Structure formats: structure tokens, C-alpha cells
């Protein structure tokens, strides 16, 4: 059984009804985690439905596949057009989009056989705020997990791979068991890495800080957008290693990601962050970000890809 979220899924070049998009139980990815994926949003904007940073997401999908040596036959342009097609086919104006490349039923054994191919799907469906409808305004409570992010020489953090998210499951589920909305992972050196499924930012004395990729953080596309928007707003941005206690002493903390968007963190480990609500710097960045879709913020980077172009 599956919870139907839309009518159609793009599956290896064909539009397949949601309930018919099936894979074999012996698919390699089910046994060994051999998949890479993306999370993308389509916003109902002043220009109509637009996919945010579409090309960058599809480039990262192919980059993730390249790191793991997964063959992908579709070009970036073909993947982008397939994405637009599935949004139109499902009559969506606002959606979460999930492209997925996975190794199917190619036989048992950790190493796929020579000449194997991958399967590619793109799903699009309505999905609201990842961490709750009120989280964008009121913020969430987070905890630092007992589970660390893996060292980059064990699991490549630049790849958005399915298997990597078992770590996220441990970080996030531990937090929820203890009554928090989200978990925060440290790297193997004890410095802040990222949230269970989000990048992390701190504000101190008007300066915006975020951990570097060397702290085992995913190169987030929303993270990159925030850095660019913040600089446009005249906010100083520093990428540097951050200690756990810096979260307690920050004026503001927020998480970022395609699903989480820009979600304030009002407490960490039960310690209130700043005033315990969405702070002024976070609010300015939120307004600039969401202003991209209302026209209040100029899209000078060409980040909005119209679905009906």
C-alpha cells in the first residue's frame, strides 16, 4: 500500500500512474542503499509556477551519481524538462519534487555487474512546511545528537545519497524521542556539522556564521542562496568551524534546506536561543528569500525556472 500524493510519476522516460510506479523487491538499492536523489521545490510565484534553482539541483543529482559511479543516461536539460512535464501532468502550481536515481534488479552482491544501468524517477506532489506549519514563524526546539556525522573519507558528504540518510534518521529520531522537533549532528572532531536534514546557521552580533563543508555538511543549494541573499542585504557572512556551545550563546539560530526552507531554532538542548523566537536577521533573510516568489526580491541570479516556459 502507498499513500497516493499525485496522479503520475515520471519513470524512465514514461508517465506512469502513481499506483503503478513499482520496483522489484530484489532491487539493488533496497539491499545496499545504492541511490542518489534531490529535493526541489516548485513555488506558485508572481510568474506562475517556478522551480527554484532547477539546474543546480539537477547538476547536483548528476554529481552525486558521478561520485558513486552510477550511470545516468539523461542530460541535465532532459531531467529538467521531465521535471516540468510531471508538474504539468499533475496540474500542480506548488510542489515538492523528488528526482531519484537508483540501481534496480541487477543481481545480488555489493558491486553491480559491468554495464549495468540505473532507473530514474521524478515525483512531484503537494507538501507544506517540513518542520510544521508554525515553525517558520515561531521556530523549533532542537537538540545536539549523540550520533555524529560520518567522516568525509568514509561517506562522501558532497553526494546526496540515500544511504547517507540512515545517519539522518538516527539524529532526527533521537531528537523526537526526547521531545524535540529536530536533531543537530556534530562532525567527528566535535564541531557543528548540520541538522538531520538541513544546513545550520548562527547569528552573533549581526554576523551570519555557518559550518564549512569540511565539517561533513552537505553543500546545500538553499544554503548557498541564503549566503548570496545575506550579502546582498549587507550582512557579513563567515564560513568557519563552530563549537556546540556557540549554539547556546548565539543571538539567532536557523536551519535551511529545500524542505525546511528557513526555519528558526528557538532553543537548543533546552537552552533558549536569543529571545526564543525568530530573530531580526533571520526574518530579513526569510523575507528576501520568499520575496523571490512574490517579486519583492529581484531574481538577479536567474534562480526561477518557469514550468510553463
Swiss-Prot record:
Transmembrane segment boundaries: none
Cofactor(s) demanded: pyridoxal 5'-phosphate
Residues the record lists as N6-(pyridoxal phosphate)lysine modifications: 160
Functional summary from the UniProt entry: Acts on leucine, isoleucine and valine.
Pfam families in UniProt: Aminotran_4
Name of this chain's protein: Branched-chain-amino-acid aminotransferase
Organism: Salmonella typhimurium (strain LT2 / SGSC1412 / ATCC 700720)
Gene Ontology molecular-function annotations: branched-chain-amino-acid transaminase activity; L-isoleucine-2-oxoglutarate transaminase activity; L-leucine-2-oxoglutarate transaminase activity; L-valine-2-oxoglutarate transaminase activity
Annotated keywords: Amino-acid biosynthesis, Aminotransferase, Branched-chain amino acid biosynthesis, Pyridoxal phosphate, Transferase
SUPFAM superfamilies hit by this protein: D-aminoacid aminotransferase-like PLP-dependent enzymes
Similarity comment: Belongs to the class-IV pyridoxal-phosphate-dependent aminotransferase family.
